[in-house]
């Protein structure tokens, strides 16, 4: 009996201890599983360095893994949470993840994973939260998570997932957050989602979903946020959405939605944000919208909405943004809008609104931005628009406003842009604009303004653009050109008289000066040549007299000079045609005389630009008379002493020789002359005009246009810009379908005309250019501007590119235009990726490698999809050997690598430095040499100094893009760090372009996403006016 009793005693003790032994053994097993999980990861920052076995490990060791970074255990010692966000991890998520049966939370967000998720995730039936957002996971999203009955949060946003949404997620009836924004999902929303009665957040924006917006979403009564924009959803907005009484945020922007806005939305009393912009919505605005009493942001822009703005909009007392631009609205602007106490942005431009602006607009709200341009509005401009002292942009152009400009407008200290052109404004320009510290842009053209331009405008330190053309102004301040930052001054078609002001500061910034069609008299001031940055000077149709100042030939950036329709006398300065930048010269209808200079520009000038000067001759005009030619050479007949007999012999012989030469010369003159004008036919007669232009088109692909088609567009009105090596024209080639190309006419380098060695040097340089153009013509990459071909003759080369409709990156970033392009970080990031990929192609996929040498924002063009294209290879170098040496420093100030200035050695790292500066522009919004920098430093040194002082780098990022969105700030700071690596002082410390690609991929932002919750959204984040106020 004793033996059985002992047996049962030990059996009982063993059975009682089994759970503890099993538990301890399994916990030890979880340590091994974690280590196996870690072995599949790449951890460059060593965040998981404490994940290691204890030194004196025993079978029943302490549960050390519960204290490892990111690991959280439950009360029984099992792994319950794995929180590994923001650790720069990459690699693969191991199948071992399924071996944590108690795992409730898995957070891998904001890392650098570029793999697929294991299907075994479906075995984690205890899972409540899974967050894999902001990575580059690809493939289909794992099926089976719907079996986790307690699942509340699924966030897979900002990845590269594709395929269809898992149908089984509809079984997870406890789900509260479902976020799949910023991926490549397609198909429709699964019908099973109708079961998600506890769902509060539904984010599917930025994918490829199609079909109709499911009506069943309107049955999910717990929903607070719906973000479905940037997809291909069609059809109408479900009326059922009006049942979502808890809804606070509705985003259906940028899709193909049609029909009317449901009136049922007016029942949503908690709704704060409605974004329906860029769809095809029609019909009238429902009056019931006035019932959304909590509404803060309402953006219905870029649709086809008709009818009037309902008066009930004036009941939305919390409204801060009202954007109805680019619709088909009619009627008046309701006066109650002026009573909205929180209104900051009112955008109504490009509609057909009539009547006047509400009299009290601006007096009851902190109005920051008013744009009602391109309507049919009339009446006076309200005087209280800046009553709150917050107004930054006043855009009223292309209407029928009348009366005077209120004096209160020019006492508004926050104003940045004033655009009131194309109205019926009368009276004088009020004084005070020179005292406005932020005013940059002033457009008052095409009105009925009279009187003088206020003297204080010349005192402005911020004004860069002034257009007062097509008015009746009569007095111009003598110091108008002294404004230190003035870049464009257009005052044509006025009644200005007297002499042109000549008070010019030492280093003026003026680039465009247009005083045409006025009554200016006297001579052209010599001091105009002090405008070192002047590109275009237009003085046509005045009453100017005297000679053309010789100093104009020394203006190094002047490209367009129009002096026509004046009373100028004397000769055309001989050096004027030798200017390497001057492309357009018009001196027609003056009183000029003497022979046309024979150098450079004048060899190809259009005779129409010279007509109306009876004394001009030679060149493309009829030849000069003998007496004029002799006098032009300074000969004195009184000093000619020859024997009459000898003289007669010489004359007779000369006549015979001259007759033969005249015939040959006549044909030569006609050939050159007929290239540009039929004017020559009035003087020389031939049987048959030349049928073809002496230009040749060399095509790099099949083209549907000719050299003549290109040449017919080389005129001033088609100029769209200038680069390092030429002037760029837009050419709309007349073929069906219409094709638009960009043509770059290369600058001519000046050289002595009679030097044989220099002539051979010119030929060698031209051969080099053609050789280089041919090489570049073979480049094929989506981020390189495609060269279609080139047109050339014996003297000049014009390169033909595909046309980029969105201009260059520099303008997009730094232009103060209120409708600029890159209004969010995602767009800027994509530009950066495009530039890096284009450079990678040049450096690694071309043989020999191509070093661009002039990477800068102005040489990065944007196509119709805002994708970056590298352009302007005028300084490009084919690098056959490492560290090749060039003969001189080339590039653009602010972008040039420091070693380039003293070694003249180039390699890929020179381009990397310039790329880093472009990245800094994208992140900070600053120019390489920005007026806000002290001590004349550049953007690189500006940031380095902040780093040395341990100042927060969050202060340098572009606040208009980042807003208050924390994850956007983090993403921009990542890009900033990459830029700092690229701009390291020593070339060896800079990454290769392939390394930049890797790092930039790790900094990938959330695709078309917003902040996690509506409360974390920066103001106007998803609206077309984001970042513009």
From Swiss-Prot:
Keyword tags: ATP-binding, Cell membrane, Developmental protein, Differentiation, Glycoprotein, Kinase, Leucine-rich repeat, Membrane, Nucleotide-binding, Phosphoprotein, Receptor, Repeat, Serine/threonine-protein kinase, Signal, Transferase, Transmembrane, Transmembrane helix
E.C. designation(s): 2.7.11.1
Phenotype seen when the gene is deleted: Reduced procambial cells number, and adjacent or interspersed xylem and phloem formation.
Glycosites: 56, 88, 92, 123, 155, 160, 171, 256, 390, 398, 448, 565, 586
GO MF, one annotated term: ATP binding
SUPFAM superfamilies referenced in this protein's UniProt entry, alphabetically: L domain-like, Protein kinase-like (PK-like), RNI-like
Residue stretches of each LRR repeat: 81-100, 101-124, 126-148, 149-172, 174-195, 196-222, 224-243, 244-268, 269-292, 293-316, 317-339, 341-364, 365-388, 389-412, 414-436, 437-461, 463-483, 485-507, 508-531, 532-555, 556-579, 581-604
Protein's job: Involved in the regulation of procambium maintenance and polarity during vascular-tissue development. Phosphorylates HIRD11 and LHCA1 in vitro.
Stated name of the protein: Leucine-rich repeat receptor-like protein kinase PXL1
């Amino acid at each position: 009996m004793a033996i059985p009793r002992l047996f049962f005693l030990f059996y009982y003790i063993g059975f009682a201890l089994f759970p503890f032994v099993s538990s301890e053994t399994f916990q030890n097993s979880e340590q091994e599983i974690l280590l196996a999980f870690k072995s599949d990861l790449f951890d460059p920052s060593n965040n998981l360095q404490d994940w290691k076995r204890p030194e004196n490990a025993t079978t029943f060791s302490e549960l050390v893994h519960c204290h490892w970074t990111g690991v959280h255990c439950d009360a029984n010692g099992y792994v319950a949470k794995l929180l590994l966000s923001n650790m720069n991890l990459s690699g693969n998520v191991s199948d071992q993840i399924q071996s944590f049966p108690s795992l409730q939370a898995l957070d891998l967000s904001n890392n650098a994973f570029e793999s697929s998720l294991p299907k075994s995730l479906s075995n984690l039936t205890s899972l409540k939260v899974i967050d894999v957002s902001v990575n580059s996971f690809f493939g289909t999203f794992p099926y089976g998570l719907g079996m986790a009955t307690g699942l509340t949060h699924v966030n897979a946003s900002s990845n590269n997932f594709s395929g269809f949404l898992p149908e089984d997620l509809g079984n997870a009836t406890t789900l509260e957050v479902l976020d799949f924004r910023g991926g490549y999902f397609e198909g429709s929303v699964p019908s099973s989602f109708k079961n998600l009665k506890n769902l509060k957040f539904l984010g599917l924006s930025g994918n490829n979903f199609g079909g109709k917006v499911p009506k069943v979403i309107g049955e999910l009564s717990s929903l607070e946020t719906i973000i479905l924009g940037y997809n291909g959803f069609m059809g109408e907005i479900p009326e059922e959405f009006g049942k979502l009484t808890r809804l606070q945020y509705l985003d259906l922007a940028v899709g193909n939605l049609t029909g009317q806005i449901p009136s049922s939305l007016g029942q949503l009393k908690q709704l704060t944000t409605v974004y329906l912009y860029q769809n095809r919505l029609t019909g009238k605005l429902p009056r019931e919208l006035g019932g959304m009493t909590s509404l803060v942001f309402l953006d219905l822009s870029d649709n086809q909405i008709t009818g009037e703005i309902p008066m009930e909009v004036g009941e939305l007392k919390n409204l801060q943004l009202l954007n109805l631009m680019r619709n088909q609205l009619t009627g008046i602007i309701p006066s109650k809008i002026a009573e909205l106490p929180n209104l900051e942005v009112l955008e109504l431009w490009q509609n057909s609104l009539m009547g006047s602006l509400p009299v009290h607009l601006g007096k009851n709200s902190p109005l920051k931005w008013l744009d009602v341009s391109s309507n049919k509005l009339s009446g006076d401009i309200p005087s209280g628009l800046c009553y709150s002292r917050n107004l930054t942009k006043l855009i009223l152009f292309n209407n029928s406003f009348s009366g005077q400009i209120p004096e209160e407008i020019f006492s508004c200290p926050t104003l940045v842009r004033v655009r009131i052109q194309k109205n019926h404004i009368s009276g004088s320009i009020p004084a005070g604009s020179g005292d406005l510290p932020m005013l940059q842009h002033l457009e008052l053209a095409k009105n009925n303004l009279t009187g003088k331009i206020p003297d204080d405008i010349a005192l402005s330190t911020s004004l860069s653009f002034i257009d007062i053309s097509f008015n009746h102004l009569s007095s111009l301040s003598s110091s108008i050109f002294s404004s230190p930052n003035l870049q464009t001054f257009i005052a044509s078609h006025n009644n200005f008289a007297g002499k042109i002001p000549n008070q010019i500061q030492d280093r003026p910034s003026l680039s465009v000066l247009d005083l045409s069609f006025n009554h200016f008299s006297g001579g052209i001031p010599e001091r105009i040549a002090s405008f070192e940055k002047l590109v275009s000077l237009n003085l046509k149709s005045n009453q100017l007299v005297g000679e053309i100042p010789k100093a104009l030939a020394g203006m190094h950036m002047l490209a367009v000079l129009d002096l026509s329709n004046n009373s100028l006398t004397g000769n055309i300065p001989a050096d004027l045609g030798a200017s390497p930048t001057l492309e357009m010269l018009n001196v027609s209808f003056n009183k000029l005389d003497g022979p046309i200079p024979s150098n450079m520009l004048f060899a190809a000038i259009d005779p129409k630009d010279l007509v109306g000067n009876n004394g001009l001759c030679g060149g493309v005009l009829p030849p000069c008379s003998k007496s004029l030619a002799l006098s032009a050479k300074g000969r004195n007949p009184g000093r000619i002493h020859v024997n009459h007999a000898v003289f007669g012999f010489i004359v007779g012989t000369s006549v015979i020789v001259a007759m033969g030469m005249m015939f040959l010369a006549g044909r030569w003159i006609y050939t050159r002359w007929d290239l540009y004008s039929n004017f020559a036919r009035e003087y020389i007669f031939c049987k048959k005009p030349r049928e073809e232009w002496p230009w040749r088109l060399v095509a790099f692909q099949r083209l549907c246009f000719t050299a003549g088609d290109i040449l017919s567009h080389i005129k001033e009105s088609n100029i769209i810009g200038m680069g390092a090596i030429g002037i760029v024209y837009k050419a709309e080639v007349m073929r069906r379908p219409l094709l638009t190309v960009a043509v770059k006419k290369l600058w001519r380098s000046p050289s002595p005309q009679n030097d044989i060695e220099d002539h051979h040097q010119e030929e060698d340089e031209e051969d080099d250019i053609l050789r280089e153009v041919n090489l570049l013509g073979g480049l094929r990459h989506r981020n390189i501007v495609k060269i279609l071909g080139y047109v050339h003759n014996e003297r000049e080369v014009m390169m033909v590119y595909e046309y980029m409709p969105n201009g260059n990156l520099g303008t997009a970033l730094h232009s103060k235009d209120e409708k600029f392009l890159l209004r969010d970080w995602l767009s800027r990031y994509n530009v950066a990726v495009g530039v890096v990929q284009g450079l990678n192609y040049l450096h690694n996929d071309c043989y020999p490698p191509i070093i661009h040498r002039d990477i800068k924002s102005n040489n990065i063009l944007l196509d119709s999809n805002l994708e970056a294209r590298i352009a302007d290879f005028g300084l490009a170098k084919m690098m056959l050997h490492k560290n090749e040496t060039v003969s001189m420093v080339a590039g653009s100030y602010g972008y040039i690598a420091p070693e380039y200035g003293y070694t003249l050695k180039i390699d890929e790292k020179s381009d990397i430095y310039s790329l880093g500066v472009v990245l800094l522009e994208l992140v900070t919004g600053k120019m390489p040499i920005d007026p806000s920098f002290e001590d004349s430093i550049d953007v690189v040194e500006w940031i380095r100094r902040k780093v040395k002082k341990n100042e927060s780098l969050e202060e340098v990022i572009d606040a208009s893009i980042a807003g208050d969105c924390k994850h956007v700030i983090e993403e921009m700071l990542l890009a900033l760090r990459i830029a700092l690596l690229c701009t390291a002082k020593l070339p060896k410390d800079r990454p290769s372009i392939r390394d930049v690609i890797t790092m930039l991929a790790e900094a990938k932002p959330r695709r078309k996403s917003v902040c996690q919750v509506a409360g974390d959204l920066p103001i106007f984040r998803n609206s077309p006016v984001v970042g513009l106020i």
